[in-house]
Amino acid sequence: MLLTIPELLDAAQLAEIRRLLADAPFTDGRYSAGADARRVKHNEEVDPSDTRVRALNQLVLMPLYRHETFQAAALPRKLSGAFFARYLPGMQYGAHVDDPVMGPEGGRYRTDVSVTVFIGEPQSYEGGELVVETDFGEQQVKLPAGHAVIYPSSSLHRVSPVTGGERLVAVAWAESMVRDPARRQMLYELYQVHEALRRDNPDAEVTRRAGHVRANLMRMWADV
């Protein structure tokens, strides 16, 4: 399931993120990639040891974690820190699958859900589409600043070459309470049905049953 989250960040948050990134030290993005991805990765990322990263993470990850759609769709158990990536003309990220397990010793997490938050406006760069392979074919994603997209980390994906301007994004990963993406999608669709029923018929028996079914499926599938 590929899902967009519109307007995750507001104008003030975006302005502060851009201010912090303006003079942040960027390093070769290959340093953070696994062995296979390193061969096809060509971008730059903010040095994770830089003092700005803490503030940048708070600006991006707190709104993400609190967002109702993210909670319902990703069912996060853990959320990684964010990587702040820059693509200049000629840079790209070839087709790859994210590493299944990330993080340092003592802080490992399974990557179930990948997140990209767009920091720059789409008209500020040429090319640079995020391309995700899904059951319905390739999906190209290039969203307005402040919007986010989430998709299963098991998906083959790439970033098309940037031919002009500067592509700025934040990327992160969630370990989900439900590791199977098909089950997560089913639970999210049940959530949508239940929310619609609660809005239109809050006291109906079918509303209670829909909530009951979703709760028991979570109990059956959740890994906590």
UniProtKB/Swiss-Prot annotation:
Query: Which keywords does UniProt give here?
Result: Dioxygenase, Iron, Metal-binding, Oxidoreductase, Vitamin C
MF (Gene Ontology): 2-oxoglutarate-dependent dioxygenase activity; iron ion binding; L-ascorbic acid binding
Question: What PROSITE patterns is this protein classified in?
Answer: FE2OG_OXY
Q: Which residues form the Fe2OG dioxygenase domain?
A: 78-176
Q: Which domain of life does this protein belong to?
A: Bacteria
What this protein needs as a cofactor is: Fe(2+); L-ascorbate
Residue numbers binding 2-oxoglutarate = 167
Q: Read off the HAMAP family from this record.
A: Hydroxyl_YbiX
Name listed for the protein in its UniProt record: PKHD-type hydroxylase Tgr7_2199
